[in-house]
Amino acid sequence: MGSREEELRFILHDLGVGPYFLGTFDKHFPGFISKDRMSCAIVNTAGRETGGVHWLAMAWHPASQTFYMFDPFGFSDQKLKQIYNFEYQGLLKRSALTSTADRCLTLIQSTQSVQGPNSAACGLFCCMFLHAFVRWPLRAMDNNPTMNLIHGVPNNMLESPSSQNVFLRNQQNLYRFLRRHSPHFVKHAAQIEADTAFDKMLTN
């Protein structure tokens, strides 16, 4: 099942992301329309009519002209298009960010996998990343107290048996992090953990 949109919004409010959060969107997300406002969003790789497939987090930091694209699986744009028919480069072209004075911006994309291949916790990992973004926007992807709680492996090792213990520890640390910071998660922990379980895709 994974995470519901309303649930992600409640958790992000608890994490202090609310003032910067534009909302949850399907693959038709129009982009960051205001180039002068620090903002972020959680975007699904599928259309809303499908019920959703995989959550990504996107964030814009105008002071440094930095666009973040966080995928818990660490897929490249080419791989996202191949698997989900989703392109973030196309999203960038639709966005007002390309109308900046010199059209010069820095794209920082996650390239390592932090989520197991059968886990349904992608939305929760996105919440964790956005917590880091609003606090440390210049080093949101790593080298901060939030993202240091999880560890990545090269995307080509996503299915490797040697990676699964790393992913399991990441998900356990993710739940621990949310228990500390989100009253909504604490109140609904049993249901949320069942919906986003490490082996959820095997049991569907």
From Swiss-Prot:
Its EC number is 3.4.22.39. Interacts with protease cofactor pVI-C; this interaction is necessary for protease activation. Requires DNA and protease cofactor for maximal activation. Inside nascent virions, becomes partially activated by binding to the viral DNA, allowing it to cleave the cofactor that binds to the protease and fully activates it. Actin, like the viral protease cofactor, seems to act as a cofactor in the cleavage of cytokeratin 18 and of actin itself. The record marks 51-52 as: Cleavage. Cleaves viral precursor proteins (pTP, pIIIa, pVI, pVII, pVIII, and pX) inside newly assembled particles giving rise to mature virions. Protease complexed to its cofactor slides along the viral DNA to specifically locate and cleave the viral precursors. Mature virions have a weakened organization compared to the unmature virions, thereby facilitating subsequent uncoating. Without maturation, the particle lacks infectivity and is unable to uncoat. Late in adenovirus infection, in the cytoplasm, may participate in the cytoskeleton destruction. Cleaves host cell cytoskeletal keratins K7 and K18. All late proteins expressed from the major late promoter are produced by alternative splicing and alternative polyadenylation of the same gene giving rise to non-overlapping ORFs. A leader sequence is present in the N-terminus of all these mRNAs and is recognized by the viral shutoff protein to provide expression although conventional translation via ribosome scanning from the cap has been shut off in the host cell. Induction: Expressed in the late phase of the viral replicative cycle. It catalyses: Cleaves proteins of the adenovirus and its host cell at two consensus sites: -Yaa-Xaa-Gly-Gly-|-Xaa- and -Yaa-Xaa-Gly-Xaa-|-Gly- (in which Yaa is Met, Ile or Leu, and Xaa is any amino acid). It comes from Bovine adenovirus B serotype 3. It is found in: Virion; Host nucleus. Keywords: Autocatalytic cleavage, Disulfide bond, DNA-binding, Host nucleus, Hydrolase, Late protein, Protease, Thiol protease, Virion. This is Protease. One of its GO terms (cellular component) is host cell nucleus. One of its GO terms (molecular function) is cysteine-type endopeptidase activity. It holds the Pfam family Peptidase_C5. It is an enzyme of class 3 (hydrolase). Gene3D superfamilies: Adenoviral Proteinase, Chain A. It comes from the Viruses. Belongs to the peptidase C5 family. The active site is at residues 54, 71, 122. GO terms for biological process: proteolysis.
